Design a protein with these regions (language model features):
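Loop-to-helix junctions at membrane interfaces in multi-pass transport proteins
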Residues: 1-11, 45, 122-270
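Residues within membrane-spanning alpha-helices of integral membrane proteins
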Residues: 60, 67, 95-98, 118-121, ...
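Helix-loop junctions at the membrane-solvent interface of multi-pass transporters
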Residues: 22, 86, 107, 133-137, ...
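Membrane-helix interface/capping residues of multi-pass secondary transporters
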Residues: 2, 90-91, 109-110, 118, ...
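Residue-level micro-sites within transmembrane alpha helices that shape
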Residues: 116-119, 191, 281
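N-terminal amphipathic, basic-rich helices that act as targeting or association modules
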Residues: 105-106, 210
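Helix-loop-helix module between adjacent transmembrane segments
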Residues: 7-105, 182-186, 195, 274-281
């Protein structure tokens, strides 16, 4: 059902808004007061007048420790994507991807990272639109997609879920709701997000930025949830095989593969989708 993805999307949207509302302006103003700090560790040291730079060292250690698995997961995703696309060894694809990412980040610094974020957001938006439109078309139209989803008990509700093994609906546990909503708390401690708050040129632009960011998150996550429902409709139409468990997360890749079999232009569009997946890692 949509409960897992739906509650996660709600949590991420709320977390995005509250992070911009509560943290953004404060950290931007205090960054200016604290010697125009350009990193979180230096901000903590300057903010609390830590002349011995103990806070800076501790902050840097924590970021390194917790960002190793975070960045490693991104490198692993790149390796899996290129390995499946081009048939190269996974380790080779991962190393090449890591070298490219680390290279442009090192050479271009924060400006390069911010610029690529902007470009990647555009690519991801285009990819979502293509997947959404193509999926609905192949599944037989919006009515067919919704009709099939409604035929599964509990599939389209947020308080129940569909059990494919028994074909019945089951109550969605409260602990699961809380766990999914808690995803939004992660935004408050992400250094790469807080750095963008610190770097904004004028705090007066934060209100507009908050509206744009929240709107983008709500729309993109809503479309992402709907793509899962569309994938179910495509399965019912016989265009895709049923995906179970963790494999259900590959639905966008499956749709891109299907799209690429319809000619040269669709193949290029499929490449755009895969680029969007890569951009999101």
């Amino acid at each position: 059902g949509i409960a897992d993805a739906g509650w996660t999307a709600i949590g991420l949207a709320i977390g995005t808004y509250l992070n911009w509302k509560i943290v953004a302006k404060r950290i931007r103003l205090y960054t200016h007061v604290a010697g125009n700090s350009i990193t979180l560790p230096s901000f903590f040291s300057n903010r609390f007048r830590d002349d011995r730079r103990i806070l800076q060292s501790i902050g840097a250690i924590f970021i390194v420790i917790f960002f190793i698995p975070y960045t490693a997961s991104g490198f692993a995703a790149c390796g899996k994507l290129f390995s499946s696309l081009f048939g190269v060894k996974y380790l080779t694809a991962m190393i090449i991807s890591a070298l490219i990412i680390v290279g442009y980040t090192t050479l271009g610094g924060f400006l390069a990272a911010s610029t690529t974020d902007f470009i990647q957001s555009i690519i991801m938006s285009i990819a979502l639109i293509i997947v959404f439109g193509f999926g609905v078309s192949v599944a037989g139209g919006p009515d067919a997609v919704i009709s099939h989803a409604k035929s599964l008990p509990g599939y389209l509700t947020m308080m129940t879920t569909y059990n494919p093994e028994t074909g019945t609906e089951a109550a969605y546990p409260l602990i699961n709701i809380v766990s999914m909503l808690a995803w939004g708390l992660g935004y408050f401690g992400m250094p790469h997000i807080l750095l963008r708050f610190m770097a904004i040129e004028d705090e007066k632009k934060l209100s507009l930025s908050r509206r744009v960011a929240t709107t983008w998150v709500v729309i993109s996550l809503a479309v992402a949830v709907m793509i899962g429902v569309i994938g179910l409709g495509m399965t019912e139409a016989g265009e895709l095989e049923m995906l179970h468990g963790a494999n259900s997360e590959t639905i966008i890749v499956k749709i891109a593969d299907l799209l690429s079999t319809h000619g040269v232009l669709p193949a290029l569009l499929g490449g755009t989708i895969l680029a969007g997946i890569l951009a999101s890692t």
